[in-house]
Amino acid sequence: MDLKRYFNAKRANAGEGFAARPGDTGWIDSLRGLQTHRGMPFLFGSEIGPDVLELRPGAPPAVIALPPTMASYVLFVQVAADRPSASPEGFGEIGPATLPVEGNPLGDRVATYGLRYADGSETDVPVLRRFAIQQNHISWSASAFAALPLRAPTVHASTGEDFVLGRAPGANFFQGEARTQSGRMDRQGENVWLYALPNPYPDKELSALSLRAEQEISLVFAVTTTALTQHPLRLQGRRKLKVRLPPGFHLNKLGELDVDDRGQQIGMDLGTVISARAVLEYSRADWLGAKVDVQPVRCGSEVIVEYSAHPDARLYLRPDDGRLHMFELRSLEGGGNASASLNVATVEPATRPVKIRIMEKDSGVRVAARLHVHGAHGEYLPPKGHHRKVNTGRFEDFSGEFANGLNQYVYVDGSCEADLPLGPVFVEICRGFEVRPLRTIVDITASTDTLTFELDRVLRWREQGWVSSDTHVHFLSPQTALLEGKAEGVNVVNLLAAQWGELFTNVADFDGRTTFGAKDFGGDGEFLVRVGTENRMQVLGHISLLGYEGEMINPLSCGGSNEAAIGHVLEATMADWAERCRQQGGLVVMPHAPNPQAERAADIVLGLVDAIEMMSFNPRTAQLSAFGLADWYRYLNIGYHLPLVAGSDKMDAAALLGGSRTYVRLGERDFTYRNWMDAVRSGDTFITVGPLVEMTVEGRRPGGTVSLPRSGGTLTIDWRIESVSVPPARVELICNGTVLEEVRCGGLSCKGQLSLPINESCWIALRVRGSVAGREADIAAHTSAVYVKVGGMPIFATADAVSVLAQIEGSIAYMDTLAPKSDEARHSRLRAALELAHHRLHHRLHELGASHHHAPVHSVHVEREH
């Protein structure tokens, strides 16, 4: 409707109740000419002359003549005057309020709208404050009850996704995570309101509208009519369509059509497209088979469109050529083809509430697990309380979820609720390396209320004295870490506080005392979380300090960015941190071998390191690092007995807690965190991404020593491997870093015995090949070493010693040239530890008569051979 001849005021000159405020965007002034809002056309006033209809108490009603019009609803764009907040009665003068009450008053009769009909009859409808109309500026939650903001809801990509797409974030981090905004501006920003006045006589022709102010001023910006039979502002719940895209469409880097409010590829008039993601096609045979990791294929020509819309909405598609294609939603949802160029299939709505329970088969006890559910079209079906799309950005999702390639999972404590579609539903449930993973297909019917799944614990290594652990987890809350640990079968989770430039994480979770999940702290003692620290320097390296008591070992980082802040001087070395950790009863671990290769060499030579860690964010992407193991071999080859541990270094939802983990044999010890640390120090460990492996050499376990006479002898090596999913492909017997024997495996378990003649001191370990993702060369497991002394002679490889010495020399060079000093005395003291390590290893080279070469190092050595 064109209201130009009825406009009687300038919105810019409206009274005090309509004045702009700081934080306004000027959006109201952009409402000019013909515009569409929430899929409805409105004609707004131009900048020339009056541009709004002001209804003022005492003034005669505005009568707007209509051509003969059949309408079910009349829609008004309008706003009431801001009403100053009044102090509550009886309080006198009051201070600032955290939650102001602007817009909360309700029920006053702002105006009366009359519908006049061609037959001469008339109907009056009251327009009440905060029902059909609301003021411009409102406080949080002061929504109108029967009107919507004119602004429609918008959908946002997450902050990380915007960066992937090469554009600036469209919303702040929080809104990006929420992925939506309602259109209501509260606390800051301006609003106008859209009200659909129902016509009680839709079968009678309208001839005019009569708008009369009652108790206060209001402004009418625009009016339109509709013949829709259902309320034009009431949308349906979420629905989905599987759409085969016409030619000319390309999915973005996320595998989606861009539904961000800045996008142009897809949209709806009377509704909102929530997402348009590529169809994921799963192999039914693989799903029901023995494959470790069943990934779907992302389809480039079909998308699942999820939306909330009015039944009479239209879907719009715009391909690369810019032409706009329109399709009636009723036709699409009816299952027919809207046109020859658009093939659609309805996706059964997920509306059946189902309780999911996960039990242990033998005991019937409810157990935590990792759960994935998807529908017949590959659509992910998260339980209530979890994201429909897991955010894999670093430091962006701590919600007990996991994204493994294209599969998404939630962590549940044995029970959850999910809205599921009728028909086949695909379920995967995992619970660590001793429980057989479950993949199945269940049929949901109209009578399905509960799904109960039983998990079969087929391996019993825990009962044999083994416990599993992840030495390296970040960002999760202790309770979330405890849940994920339970669900992944990880008995010990080490959650590490850390510094990242100016960012500090998990610091408030550290108290130097609490072991979450322990019996002393209200748990059952079977799954534990302990907060330690990862203390870090960009050049000299990182060190994990686990389980220490008392005060936090600070600084968490130093020596400048990125680990510390710019300008943060070198006020500690890793040796300094390690000594303090030992003094406070903790376990010192060198994380994520082989990097950074610098001071770790000195600290190992000084005997300050209890274990060395191999790291894998997610075994599907990369398993146990050959480079990290080669670095560990180097230290074993010069006589430093370091147990192996493993951790995930989890920093995002794409990293799997316990994906690479340590198994530690407690033996006769009770399971406590302190006993776990002692067991790690004793060295009977193995690391794995699936297969469990045990080895003895002449009955001695890893961490132990076999002594032989100077003449040597033949050693008997016994081993066994068991797995619930990742098959061991072959077993390699490693001696001093070299493969001496190789045995092929078949199936999920194997065992054997080898004889090995030995005539010099060495170390022996088992390395297991096998893959989560089907890569033949992947390393799936590795034991710590058994040490063999022949005639009391040491293990010492000169080339490895020289390599380690060079790392120490490099660390000294850094301290002498680039390290930002605190003060001379402290710097000299810190440097002295590195000099001591250099002296010890250098002296050992001379003591053993090993010829070696020094690299030129600033102020330490000149180039020479001896």
Enumerate the predicted regions with their spans.
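N-terminal/edge-of-domain interface segments
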Residues: 1-299
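Surface-exposed acidic, glycine/proline-enriched linker/cap segments
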Residues: 156-188, 387-415, 511-520
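Catalytic cores of extracellular degradative/oxidative enzymes
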Residues: 434, 462-644, 648, 654, ...
